[in-house]
Amino acid sequence: MDVQHSSIHHRLQVLAVWAIASLIGLLIFNLGGLDTPQTYWSAAKPSYLQHVAFWDSEWYYRVATQGYPDSISLPIGQDGRVGQNTWAFMPIYAYLSGGLAKLLSANYYTCAVVVAWLGSALAALGLDAWMRPRVGKAASLLGVAIFFTCGPAIILQLPYAESLGLALVAIGFAVLAKRRFAWAMVAFVLAAFTRPIGVPLGAALGLWWVWEELRARGLISTSRFDASFSSDRVYADADPYAANYEAAAASYVASTAPVPNEAAIASFETAPDLTASSSFEAAPPAAVPAPPSETPPIPSPAPAPQALPSFTPMDLSPMPLSSKDRLWLFVTAAVTCAAALTWPLLAWIATGRMSAYVDTETAWRGVDLAPFEAWINRSASFGGAHAGVIGLFGVLVLSACILGWRQLRQLGRLTWIWCVCYWVYLLIFFDPSSSVFRMLLMVAPLAWAVAVKLVSRPRAALAVLTVGVVTQVLWVAWVWDYGSISILWVP
C-alpha cells in the first residue's frame, strides 16, 4: 500500500496501525493472565479488571478515592522517614478516571482503562504529528508500529498515567514546533501534573532556548555539530496542520528549482527562422555605446535567501530563530519549570514538611535521594561491589552511543535535547529496576529514528516488529504477572 498517495486520511492510518498493535498487546496480556498465580491483588487466573489492577494501578485508585495525606495523615515511621503514600502519584489521570467513574456510576478500573486507551490513541496521533514532518508519512507509520509493539508499550493500555503523560508531551512538542506557544504551555503544564516529568521538560526547553540564543549570536551556528540537526529532507506531505501542504510544497519546490537550461536551448533550436521571410527587414545598425561614466554603477543587491517552507519544524531550521520566537521559547520554558516546582510546593503546604514529595519518592528505595548513587548501588547488587562498576560504565557508554546517533539528531534539536535531558534525568535521580523499561517510553522518538532506517527494508522492519511482540510476551510474563515464571521483576 502506497501510504504517500493513499486516499485514506493519514490520521486514520495512524489509528489503524495503533489499534492493531494495541490489540496484539491486549491478546498477550489476557493470555498472560491465564498463567498468573495467586498474588497480593487477586486469586490465580484473574479476570481482566483484576489483572489490570496490579501494581501502581492501586495507587491511582487511592488518589481518586482518598486524595492526598495532610500533616496528620502523612505516614511517618519510627525512624522519622516518610512512608509510601499517594504524593508520589500525580493527580490528573487519577482524577479523570475517578471523575468518569462517578459520572457514569461505573467501576473505577473500567473507567481508568478507558482513559488509558484514549490517552494511548492520543499519544499515537501526537507522536505522529511530532515526528511526521521529520521523517515522512511512511516512516512515521512504521514508527507508530515499532513503538506500540515494544515490550513496555502494553502499560499504555493499563490504569497507569503513562499514556496520558506521553500524549501531552508529544502534542506539546508538535504544536511548539509550529510556534503555537500558548498551546504548548498548556500541554506541558498538564503533563507536569500527570507524570513527574516537569523537571526534564523544563530543562529541555531551557537548554534549547540557550542553544538558540547562542545560534542567534553566531557562536555555534556555523559548527558542524549544529548543522547535523538540520535534515536534508523536506517532507512536504508531513505537515499535520496545514490543509494546503501539498500546494505549499509544490510552490516551494518550483520557487527553488534551477532554470532548466536544456529546455531553453531546445526551444531556441526549434524556433522558426524569421530571416527566411520575405517581410524580413534588416535591423538598424547598433548604436555606438556611450563612454563609461566616471561614477561606478551601484551593485544590485544580492538575492534574498529562499524562505523555508511554512511546514518546516522550528527546531529543524538551519537559520537561528527570530527574537520573538526566542522570547516565547523562554516564556514556555519558564512556565514549564514553574509547573515542575508546583507539585512539591503543594505537598509542602499540605503536609507542613518541606521535603514531603522527595521523601515520598524515596520511600520505595529506603534511602535518601543522592544523584547517581542509586545506579551505583544497583550495579553493585547485580554485579558485585567491584564488577558492578564496570556494568555501570557500560550503561553510560551505551547511553552515549544511543544519544549520539546521527539519525536521532536529525529528528531536530528539541527532539534530541528532550531525549538527552530525560535520559540524564533518569541516570541522576531514578532508582534503576525493571521499571526503567516503562520509564524509557518517554524517549519514543528513538522508534522513529529506527523507522527511518527500516522504511525501505521491509524484511528488517518485519523482524524488528516481531522482536517487539516477543518482548511484550516477556514483559507481561516477567514483569507484570508477578512471578508467573521464575524471574520476578516489577513494572
Where do the protein language model's features map onto the residues?
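Transmembrane-helix motifs of polytopic, lipid-linked glycan transferases
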Residues: 98-99, 111-134, 399-404
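Membrane-interface alpha helices of multi-pass inner-membrane proteins
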Residues: 148, 169-174, 182-209, 335-338, ...
